[in-house]
């Protein structure tokens, strides 16, 4: 019998509807907070198949290539002292003079053992890292918190921060997230000391229950070439020891990197309950058997802090483990948010694969059109989370800028745009009218439910697939604890399913609030004309499963899941997958 493993549930997830994510006192990103131990241990038992209880570690060595990039601050492992910074417009703090870095487009890419690699990524992660970015203590939600006027920025753009704190003073440390010799981040910039203040309560807009803060700007800085493209955590550090994060993606519109990692900020915003409202719940409890809650918000705003993850939302569990793995292996990556795809769908054709790492339910019409157009032109699509493209939303401006409010009335008839601009009307499901486009027509599987209390093994169903290359896994072998939270499965009853869907794993799961047994599927298919490949994991827990477990957990899935993930990178980063690995329909073996 295998030893016990634990299910971890983020504190902010509503009990009726959010992701149960595994984690622990982990050695890879030790010290992350914002998780609690789930209500029950679960024991993975044998089901007439081989259960992997102890996974042999595979030693993978990243080749470091020096291209003469100058080091930046960040070698320290304690909280860095702030240095004075120049005063920007309006009394804010702006970045001072800094050393220029080599252009990330300067060196050609090459095929490596784990996928398409880029020397600049290898060199960037050879720079001194730091563990000072980790928030390890228990933080008061109101000790220090903030938000930015942008969720993404590029070179030359100004970023304003709006901070409320009980501290007399605070400063900001900007960390680029990656591998950095296992330390996980590099310090790129620090502000000077800024006077702290407690900002006003954030008003709720009647009728739509939107919480949108009207705070005074605390400081600003300008992104310059020292801010290498990537995912950043801006750590707010109060003089009294208060700490929290503000996430920021720095993106490069000129990038032609093989891999686009797209942060699902729309879904993070939709589940952000700061101020008492999100698109799933309101300040008062749901009425019995009434879902979604009638008191929920109809519009949510980025003009407010994230209530969970010490201000980082779900980033550290649902996205960061993939960033860390890809940069450890020097993969040729660039970073977007889903707002990038919504605003610049035409740029997707410059890349080989679009990767949606975590929970990615909320998609706008322009996002979906961009992904479909890209796939029709040969761009591969990877959905590492479950329930992607589940709900149809639209973006609109807030007082701080364009595309900072996310709209979903859930009932399209209640949307003011219904009958006026049906292409932009919000919907509970993409498959309902007026869109009539189920997510499964693109991702190859449908959302079938969730389980936030228990995880289940991922069961191999196509052992000869490229996904399992080099693993030694045979048919019926299982990887413990991978299938959890939201689930996807192939549905043969849907007439518009893509052809040639290949079920790579077919895993028995139990859905909460439904006692019957279901399955969760990892699926893959290729398009006949463009040869693009589409991969869907079938679980929200794929990316969290990349994180090493506590030493006491002997049946940790991390090593095997990293191998599978790198197999996806190797195959999908080489160009249209159908040219080398065309899918072979096998769904009839499971749903015939």
Feature annotation, model-predicted:
Residues 199-213, 219-222, 226-228, 311-397, ...:
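Helical hinge/lid and interdomain linker segments adjacent to catalytic or ligand-binding clefts
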Residues 1-46:
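Terminal targeting segments of Actinobacterial cell-envelope proteins
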Residues 115-143:
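Proline/serine/threonine-rich low-complexity linkers at boundaries of modular beta-sandwich domains
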Residues 145-168, 174-180, 185-247:
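Ligand-binding face of N-terminal immunoglobulin V-set domains in extracellular IgSF glycoproteins
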Residues 62-99:
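C-terminal region of N-terminal signal peptides and the immediate post-cleavage residues
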Residues 165-170, 174-178, 185-193, 240-347, ...:
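Aromatic-Pro/Gly-enriched surface loop or interdomain linker
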